[in-house]
Amino acid sequence: YDGKSFDATRRALLQLGLLSMGHLGAVFGGAGEVDPVSHLVATAVGWGGLPRTEASYFSAGPLPGDADKPHELILSDVPTNAFWSITLYNQRGFMVPNGTLSVNALNNVNATPRDDGSYRIQLGGCNAKIANCIPTPKGWNYLLRAYQPSESILLGDWQPPKAMPIEMLTE
C-alpha cells in the first residue's frame, strides 16, 4: 500500500469531481448502468452512493474568490418522493468539526421552512441566531441529495438553484 500515491490519486479524482459541479448522473448502480469514468470519480468523492432511481446527487461550491463569503441557497419544491439533504465538505471531501453549532448537514425534516414553505439555507457566517446555517470549512463545497427523485430530476428537467454570496443578493 502506497499512501502517498493513494492520496495523490484521490486528490486528482476529487478535482475532477469538483469540475463536474452539477448533477452527477448515473454514477452508482450495476454494471452496464453507470458510466465507468464518472463512477470512478464519484467513488473517490463519495463511496456510499445509491442507484439513480434511489438518489440523485448535485455537487456545487463557491465561485473562485467567493469561498470566504457567506452564501444563501433557497430550496422550494424539490421534486422528490422521499426527502432532500445538503451536506458540506472540506477541500479533501470530508465533513469536519465546526465549533459550537455542530452542523454539517440539513434536510427538509430538520431544517425550518419559511412561511411560504421554501427553505433558506445559509452557508457560512453562522451564529446561534441564524436558522438553517451550516458553517463552511476551508475549501468548502456541498452536495444536494434528492432521495427517490421524481421523473423531472431523472429526466434532467429540474436543476437545483446555486448558492449565491449573500452580498450579491442584497446589492
Q: What is the predicted role of each segment?
A:
Residues Y1-E171:
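A compositional/structural signature for long, glycine/proline-rich flexible linkers
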